[in-house]
């Protein structure tokens, strides 16, 4: 699966919605391609006081629930974006620690180039 397909899958899940008086969801979506060839998708949940979580965390939780944790490729995108966005530092570290080989995970960046978690997180654990 190429990055255009992953980005298309993520874009289909991006849709900001109010889920409660204090929380929104769906402003960012992520699609992850596993080593087994499965795609896992998640959306962010934004709440006051930083209690929410990122789309990458959501997709990884679904992936782990399905018995997988090795990520080959990933893409994230926002509600107002026609392009990919890089994972935040917290997500980079989370991706890195859920499987020993995830530092090799390829990531689509805003400019259309591809890098790895290892390059985005040079001082990884």
Language-model segment annotations:
Residues 1-20, 68-125:
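C-terminal binding/interaction regions
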Residues 22-24:
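A short catalytic or substrate-binding loop motif that flags glycine-/basic-rich loops and adjacent residues
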Residues 27-34:
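Short beta-strand scaffold segments in enzyme catalytic cores
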Residues 38-39:
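Hydrophobic "anchor" residues
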Residues 43-57:
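Compact, glycine-rich, soluble single-domain proteins
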Residues 54, 58, 90-93:
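Short amphipathic alpha-helical face segments that pack within enzyme cores
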Residues 55-75:
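Short, solvent-exposed cationic patches
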